[in-house]
Amino acid sequence: MNCEEYRKKLKLNYGNREKLKVLKELYQMEVDEITKLNILDDVFELLTSTKERGFEDIISTHYTSDSKNKAIIYYCIKIIEKVGIKYPNLVYIYIPYLIKLLDSEFECIRFASAEALANIPSKLTIYAYPKLIKKLDNEVYAKVLVKLIMKSDNKEAILLKLFENFNEYSLYVIKELYKYDKELVYEFIPLILKEFGNNGLYSFLQK
């Protein structure tokens, strides 16, 4: 298919099954193939116009795991991420919306957005850290937060925020950062002592 054919099938008047088929096809392409189609804005438009809850979610008494809507959103995110890893300048205007999706009610969307923000080499992604710290209750967010901190020119400020809501996943972040920048972590030893005491600090430094 050419660019216009892809665009036509991503429009709202086409069924979700067809849109999903096209998105999967796009995702399997090489990055340069996707960019040559000049279709990123169409993918983003589909992302922002697709409701998280499809008809099958609304009529079901339970959350469905195979919603076409969720899958469409997921693949839109993954396409933006794939292009953004190689060409961050082509996706930077989409980054605020990816940050917004961290508030999604669906884990698959939240995690896909978080991983995209971690992997796109743009400083704009760092602005996701307040949401991640606030909802730091899983290892996916912890790993993403490590990557965002490593991108930042002001790592200390983010770490100070981390200590405001410290938990086991915060400790994971500190341990991972310790592998890359011991001096940075040493500055926060007093706060680690406050949270875990001498035994906790010794255990932490030995790992």
Swiss-Prot record:
It comes from the Archaea. InterPro entries: ARM-type_fold (IPR016024). This is Uncharacterized protein MJ0078. The lineage of its organism: Archaea, Methanobacteriati, Methanobacteriota, Methanomada group, Methanococci.
